[in-house]
A protein has these predicted regions:
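Extracellular, disulfide-bonded carbohydrate-recognition/adhesion ectodomains
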Residues: 1-193
Length: 193
């Protein structure tokens, strides 16, 4: 006859002993099934002097593993390259590229600032680079603090990997900067091959 306490211990060993259950639960809670799944990295930006920058659409982007609040991250982007800002996203393929970049450089901390913020409790999100708000891929139920000053800045990879969330702007996160390639390439200059 098996005692009920023994069954509990046996279940604990089976579920937690291998670590697989905890890994699966963490992945479920995070909204993903396999963070390390292969993804398609974008091509290098190929602008001379800009290593670790990748071409995503018409911009070059770079991941920065230096947690800053939203405002400091935006200003840090501006110091890296003339005309640079926190990244804006305009189609799903570009969103996927950004996710791949984050996975490559910091697979254990996927949360990053995007260059989006809510304009004065209006419920309208804008990109810091002034580009059109023509794409969004929010986590279910987000943004959930519109018309307040609680969470006015946008992040990626909070609860569902590859999706967005509104968060408090003072929170420190890693981030991705972007600049328009044509702003750096001067007429007659050559791209690095």
């Amino acid at each position: 006859m098996v005692k009920s306490g023994s069954i509990g211990v046996l279940l604990m060993i089976l579920l937690f002993g291998s670590g697989n259950f905890l890994k699966l639960e963490r992945e479920f809670v995070a909204g993903r099934t396999n963070v390390t799944a292969r993804c398609s990295m974008p091509k290098p930006c190929n602008v001379y002097g800009f290593t670790d920058w990748y071409k995503v659409g018409s911009v070059c982007v770079k991941y920065f593993d230096r947690p800053l609040n939203f405002t400091d991250a935006e200003f840090n982007c501006r110091t890296k390259v003339p005309g640079a800002h926190l990244v804006s996203v305009h189609e799903e393929k570009h969103n996927d590229y950004l996710l791949c970049i984050v996975k490559k450089f910091n697979p254990n901390n996927l949360r990053i600032w995007l260059g989006a913020f809510e304009l004065f409790k209006s419920g309208q999100f804008l990109w810091v680079d002034g580009s059109n708000w023509d794409f969004q891929i929010w986590t279910r139920g987000e943004p959930n603090h519109m018309y307040t000053s609680i969470e006015e800045c946008a992040e990626m990879n909070w609860k569902e990997i590859g999706r967005w969330n509104d968060d408090a702007c003072h929170v420190k996160k890693n981030y991705i900067c972007a600049f328009k390639r044509n702003a750096i390439l001067k007429p007659g200059s050559e791209e690095m091959e």
